[in-house]
């Protein structure tokens, strides 16, 4: 046990990564000089060096002085030298604690007989593919290697296994490999120094043993007499039935736990009869060898003959995989009372009968995958009372009436379209890669008693034609439904209760089911669910409450999630959300912030969590996107909503008030004026004193006097009422009788702050009115300010107004007032007219930048 532990430690030392060491350097413990073009052992080594790696160099000589004293060195790698190697006597004596010496794939031109002396603690010696001859075994090269446990001499030029007597001293030797040599025979006297030893492995793979020469079996006798072998590897030697039988005869009585005869040529194969299949006598002599494992895989056996293994009472594992077995003879397995594992995979079996497996009272595992089995009799496996695992994957089965009540049934890769509702129990049921379509089969399987693991990947589950009774299965722990078409079933509104009653389910796979939504409450009963895979579907959104409450691991990768809510993932321990189609706008800022702050373990590379929109951010990692511009918007989101409500209400009220005001504008204006008078009741209206006698000269046709007096003058002129505030001038009252009419007009225009022309049909026909209009325009030009106010009265159109040249010039440049048609607007109009009269107009300064020049006169 101590030797095996030391060997394990040595292997660990060798396999440890050296990537942290710079090439052609040493860190004190590891000296890494692989491929450094060295021609000799470097002397710059530290005495603390434990591993020295010198492969792939040009070192051609190793002698006693090649190494400094390295008492801690445990691994020396000198393999694959590009120069022929000469190893002198005591070449490694300065490495007293060496555990592993690797010289493999170096062409050793000279190997001194004392080359390995001084290595009392050596556990493993690798001399594979070194060009060594049989002399390395017969001349005592391995003397005094008392700790040697593993010797690898594979791939050399050894033709004889005649061992030197010093092998008797190698009490720790347990693993010897002579594979890939040309050793045509082995006889009893050659391995005599190994008698009394127990070897864990003895390799003779591809040595052409007994297959190229005529062997005197009686004189050669048992080469393994007195040797106990745990594993004897005789594969790829081209053994026929006769060679196998003769070898079994000469080694009878030798204890061999595992016999490997892979890649043999026993059996005719399919369609041939020139080579015999093994029969009852082939392995009969192994009865006293206590063989526990027999590997006959990769051959050409076509038929398993009756009682073929009848004498192998102790056999526990039989491997017949990769043959051409098409027929199992009657009682072919008779006598295998202890067999536990039977491997018949990768053969040509087409049907199985009730009698095929008679004689296997303790078999627990039967592997029949990758045959062509299309039909099985109902009682074929039910007679195997201890059967625990039945592997029938990748066959052509269309029915499962034969299923026994066992722990594990593997039926993936068959042609099952419908499952008969038979009664059976199982712990593990695998039915992937079949042709199941109706979810009624899923409901049936979920009711199988004691079922803990159910695999239905890569079927066609898509149909749900009727309501089903929910499955009550308190034992199911893992359910795999990857690569089906559940979307087609669920979009009809049926089978939403398929997971109801699965109270102990812990793992659920729903990947690749074309799901674009999750039915409401689909996971409500999965109170124990810890892991859920929804990857590779078409989900765009996950609704709050759609995930199980106790979920810890969620795979939602390769969907079409746009803006997921991070609150859904806050209770998870592990999350895979890679390869989705994220829309990178401010709505995603909360999720981006969560990604950078969460304690949830996120699977995948950050580069796999990327934007799909907008195009400016296409392919950019969410981890690299700044959300600073969105912080203010996020903080103001609730305020914005409140403002939205406020604005909506305000706008509605405004529209209502506007409609009311428009409808009852006259009343509203009167109320406004009343309030204004109440507010300013203590203030006396006073006009700024100035040079004007009147506030306004009202010019109108005498034919319009009655209307003007009733509509305007009584409401504006202070002489009519003390409540009026304007001093008005008009012809009928204020013109001086007998005075020149032009003078009166001129005095009225120039003596008033503003001139108001009431343009009506009579006005346009009255010459004096038009003359007063021209005087007012003349004053406007003189004072460089607008003192003319035009009020259009009646139904005069724009065309009628523009016909008069005097009026046209004003209307093209100035605004005018029109007497309201609705009586409720009269008050507002009078107020506006008063405001226009009282409004002070600032005159424009005359430009002084215009230079005048004298124009020559022509006489």
Swiss-Prot record:
Record domain LRRCT: where: 580-632
Compartments (UniProt record): Membrane
Keyword Transmembrane helix appears in the UniProt entry: yes
Outcome (variant: residue 399 to T): In strain: MOLF/Ei
PTM description: Phosphorylated at Tyr-799 upon flagellin binding; required for signaling.
Cytoplasmic side: 663-859
Secretion signal, residue range per the UniProt entry: 1-26
GO molecular function annotation: transmembrane signaling receptor activity
Gene Ontology annotations for the cellular component aspect, listed alphabetically: membrane
Keywords, in A-Z order: Disulfide bond, Glycoprotein, Immunity, Inflammatory response, Innate immunity, Leucine-rich repeat, Membrane, Phosphoprotein, Receptor, Repeat, Signal, Transmembrane, Transmembrane helix
PTM annotation (Phosphotyrosine): residues: 799
SUPFAM superfamilies: L domain-like (SSF52058), Toll/Interleukin receptor TIR domain (SSF52200)
Summary of the function given for this chain in its UniProt record: Pattern recognition receptor (PRR) located on the cell surface that participates in the activation of innate immunity and inflammatory response. Recognizes small molecular motifs named pathogen-associated molecular pattern (PAMPs) expressed by pathogens and microbe-associated molecular patterns (MAMPs) usually expressed by resident microbiota. Upon ligand binding such as bacterial flagellins, recruits intracellular adapter proteins MYD88 and TRIF leading to NF-kappa-B activation, cytokine secretion and induction of the inflammatory response.
Protein name, UniProt field: Toll-like receptor 5
């Amino acid at each position: 046990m101590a030797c095996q532990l030391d060997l394990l430690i040595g292997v660990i030392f060798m396999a440890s990564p050296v990537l942290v060491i710079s090439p052609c350097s040493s860190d004190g413990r590891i000296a890494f000089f692989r491929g450094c073009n060295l021609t000799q052992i470097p002397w710059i080594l530290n005495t603390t060096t434990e591993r020295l790696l010198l492969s792939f160099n040009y070192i051609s000589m190793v002698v006693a002085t090649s190494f400094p004293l390295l008492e801690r060195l445990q691994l020396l790698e000198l393999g694959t030298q590009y120069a022929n190697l000469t190893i002198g006597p005591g070449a490694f004596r300065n490495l007293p604690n060496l555990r592993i010496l690797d010289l493999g794939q170096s062409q050793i031109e000279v190997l001194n007989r004392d080359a390995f002396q001084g290595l009392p603690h050596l556990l493993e010696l690798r001399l594979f593919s070194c060009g060594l001859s049989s002399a390395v075994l017969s001349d005592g090269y391995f003397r005094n290697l008392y700790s040697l446990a593993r010797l690898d001499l594979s791939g050399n030029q050894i033709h004889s296994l005649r061992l030197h007597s010093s092998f008797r001293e190698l009490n720790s030797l347990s693993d010897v490999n002579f594979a890939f040599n040309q050793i045509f025979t082995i006889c009893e006297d050659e391995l005599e120094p190994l008698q009394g030893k127990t070897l864990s492995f003895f390799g003779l793979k591809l040595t052409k043993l007994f297959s190229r020469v005529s062997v005197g079996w009686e004189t050669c006798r048992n080469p393994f007499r007195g040797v106990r072998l745990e594993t004897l590897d005789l594969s790829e030697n081209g053994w026929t039935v006769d060679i196998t039988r003769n070898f079994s005869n000469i080694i009878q009585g030798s204890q061999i736990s595992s016999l490997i005869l892979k890649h043999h040529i026993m059996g005719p194969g399919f369609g041939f009869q020139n080579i015999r299949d093994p029969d009852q006598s082939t392995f009969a002599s192994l009865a006293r060898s206590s063989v526990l494992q027999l590997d006959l895989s990769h051959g050409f056996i076509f038929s398993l003959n009756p009682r073929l293994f009848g004498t192998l009472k102790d056999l526990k594992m039989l491997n017949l995989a990769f043959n051409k077995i098409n027929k199992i003879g009657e009682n072919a397995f008779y006598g295998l009372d202890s067999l536990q594992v039977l491997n018949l995979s990768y053969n040509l079996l087409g049907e199985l009968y009730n009698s095929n497996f008679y004689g296997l009272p303790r078999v627990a595992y039967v592997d029949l995958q990758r045959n062509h089995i299309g039909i099985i009799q109902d009682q074929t496996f039910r007679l195997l009372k201890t059967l625990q695992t039945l592997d029938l994957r990748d066959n052509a089965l269309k029915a499962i009436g034969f299923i026994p009540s066992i722990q594990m049934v593997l039926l993936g890769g068959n042609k099952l379209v419908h499952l008969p509702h038979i009664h059976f129990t199982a712990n593990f049921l695998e039915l992937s890669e079949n042709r199941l379509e109706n979810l009624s089969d899923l409901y049936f399987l979920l009711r199988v008693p004691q079922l803990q693991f159910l695999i239905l990947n890569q079927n066609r589950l898509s149909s749900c034609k009727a309501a089903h009774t929910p499955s009550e299965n308190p034992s199911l722990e893992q359910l795999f439904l990857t690569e089906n078409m559940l979307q087609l079933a669920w979009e009809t509104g049926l089978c939403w209760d398929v997971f109801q009653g699965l109270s102990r389910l812990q793992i659920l796979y729903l990947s690749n089911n074309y799901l674009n939504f999750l039915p409401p409450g689909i996971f409500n009963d999965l109170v124990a669910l810890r892991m859920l895979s929804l990857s590779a579907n078409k989900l765009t959104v996950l609704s709050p409450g759609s995930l199980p409450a106790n979920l810890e691991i969620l795979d939602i990768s390769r969907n079409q999630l746009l803006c997921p809510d991070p609150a859904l993932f806050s209770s998870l321990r592990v999350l895979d959300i890679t390869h989705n189609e994220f829309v990178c706008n401010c709505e995603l800022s909360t999720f981006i912030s969560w990604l950078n702050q969460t304690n949830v373990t996120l699977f995948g590379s950050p580069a796999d969590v990327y934007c799909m929109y907008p195009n400016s951010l296409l392919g950019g990692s969410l981890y690299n996107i700044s959300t600073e511009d969105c912080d203010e918007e996020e903080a103001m989101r609730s305020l914005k909503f409140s403002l939205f409500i406020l604005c909506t209400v305000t706008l509605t009220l405004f529209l209502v008030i506007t409609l009311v005001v428009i409808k009852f504008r006259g009343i509203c204006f009167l109320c406004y004026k009343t309030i204004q008078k109440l507010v300013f009741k203590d203030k006396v209206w006073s006009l700024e004193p100035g040079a004007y006698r009147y506030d306004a000269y009202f010019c109108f046709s005498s034919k319009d006097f009655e209307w003007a007096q009733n509509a305007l003058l009584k409401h504006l002129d202070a002489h009519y009422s003390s409540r009026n505030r304007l001093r008005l001038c008009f012809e009928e009252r204020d013109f001086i009788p007998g005075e020149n009419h032009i003078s009166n007009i001129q005095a009225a225009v120039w003596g008033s702050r503003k001139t108001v022309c009431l343009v009506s049909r009579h006005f346009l026909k009255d010459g004096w009115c038009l003359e007063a209009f021209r005087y007012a325009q003349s004053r406007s030009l003189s004072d460089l300010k607008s003192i003319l106010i035009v009020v259009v009265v009646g139904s005069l159109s724009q065309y009628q107004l523009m016909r008069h040249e005097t009026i046209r010039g004003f209307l093209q440049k100035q605004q005018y007032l029109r007497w309201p048609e609705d009586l409720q607007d009269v008050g507002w109009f009078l107020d506006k007219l008063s405001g226009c009269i009282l409004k002070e107009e600032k005159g424009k300064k005359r430009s002084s930048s215009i230079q005048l020049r004298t124009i020559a006169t022509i006489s």
